[in-house]
Amino acid sequence: MIQTLTDLSALRALVNGWKREGLRVALVPTMGNLHAGHYSLVMLARQYADRVVSSVFVNPTQFGPNEDFARYPRTPEADLRGLEDAGCDALWLPDVDTMYPLGTALATPIHAPGVSDVLEGECRPGHFDGVCTVVARLFNQVQPDVAAFGKKDYQQLAVIRQMVADLAFPIEILGGSIVREADGLAMSSRNQYLSAEDRPISSTIRKVLLQMRDSYAAGTPRAQVEDAASHTLEQAGFRVDYAVVRLPDLSEPGDSHAGARVALIAARLGNTRLIDNLEF
């Protein structure tokens, strides 16, 4: 049966006990309102560790002033059942005082330069500082050997990898594949914000990503690929933050089309902001 912990000393005692037995420990950090994508990360982590801890903490420092912190969905009972079914061993439920003992205003910030400052970093200033700050604290609290993050948040994964490399965290970072609805929409806790009218339109993002891949692979200039993608999304009713092709490190590619690329989209449909990506 899954253990639920709200006390840091109890969490550390549990993890230290596992490690004394020679067991590898994985962490799957979440903000709750879990879905099949999150549970797939638990199952991925299980392949690389003997015990899996998942955390649920809606982190106030990664939400902007006009974002959805107050209304972010919280579904604790369903989360617990789903995590247990997925094979999670322990659920860590810190409160704000545990996570930020000096308060959020005095929290020591962590900034990952470069990769944090483009795309999502431009659209949501300070977002990745909040992500890095809370993830570093979770790493310190849980002391995992492995941690799993979803590739849907492609840039977040890149930011965390950079932070881990720079700060020498002895943690292996796993990237879990995007889990999609039947029509191709990437699973997200925010999908439930979509209206009944907008939900069928939302899968357009996946179709546009595939078009971007195919057009770019056929030799179409990058700027033309990006402009066409934005136009298609706008025609469908989206307000586009970005639709771009980048190198895997999120820098802008030159004129050559050789090598790995990733197409990334962020766009609003109604009141819902959706992000997705496609590696190719």
UniProtKB/Swiss-Prot annotation:
ATP binds at residues 31-38, 150-153, 179, 187-190. Beta-alanine binds at Q62. Pfam families: Pantoate_ligase. GO terms for biological process: pantothenate biosynthetic process. It catalyses: (R)-pantoate + beta-alanine + ATP = (R)-pantothenate + AMP + diphosphate + H(+). Catalyzes the condensation of pantoate with beta-alanine in an ATP-dependent reaction via a pantoyl-adenylate intermediate. This is Pantothenate synthetase. The lineage of its organism: Bacteria, Pseudomonadati, Pseudomonadota, Gammaproteobacteria, Lysobacterales.
